Amino acid sequence: IDDYQQACFDGRISWIGEDTLARFMDAVLEQSQETPEESAEPIRVLYTPLCGTGLECVSQVLGRIGIPYLDVVPGQDQPDGDFPTCEYPNPEERAALQAGIDKCRSWKEMGKPFDLLLATDPDADRVGVACEDGDDYTLVTGNEMGILLMDYLAGRRVARGEDLSRLVAVTTIVSSAMCDDVAAHYGFELRRTLTG
């Protein structure tokens, strides 16, 4: 710790400032295919960072794209490396999302259902989604999400009149073969890489 404190004092280590976060948010939003004005109607999102670091960035991005209602799963909003409310904080595992699913159910019973349960892993580089499915909530797998995003992004470009024949999408060797079908449908090249 002495070396760390000395490095901070000497200016060799510095904290990332709000300006860096703002530039990051701008870069993320530049990738958006749709503005809030184009959206059919506002959605209600329940979010959990699973006791990790995602709350600030995710809530800012969702707010800036016009999500009018964002609520957070209680007890999972602040970073806590002991993960007291979810033993295994993987957003693709149902057990990790159970507190969020329970809150979705209770709000649905009150007549205020959420449209989407969104979760990020503790370092906010993986995402999980659960959607209402009758009386239950279904998790969208990583493969399903990738295919949905690929189809959505390609479809938006086609709707704007873009020629996709010169585009290349990249996925991994473990991703669903449906990626090939989406690429063939829209006429762009798909390349596969090793994982990691």
Regions picked out by a protein language model, each given a short descriptive name:
Residues 75-78, 122, 174, 195-196:
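Short, ordered loop/turn segments at secondary-structure junctions
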Residues 2-16, 133-196:
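Proline/glycine-rich low-complexity loops and linkers
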Residues 1-110:
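Gly/Ser/Thr-enriched, mixed-charge loops and adjacent short helices
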Residues 44-48, 71-72, 117-119, 126-130, ...:
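Structured core elements
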Residues 38-41, 110-113, 160-166:
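Short helix-terminating capping/connector loops at secondary-structure junctions
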Residues 104-134, 182, 188-192, 196:
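Glycine-rich phosphate-binding loop
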Residues 49-55, 124-126, 174-177:
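Gly/Ser/Thr-rich loops at beta-strand to alpha-helix junctions
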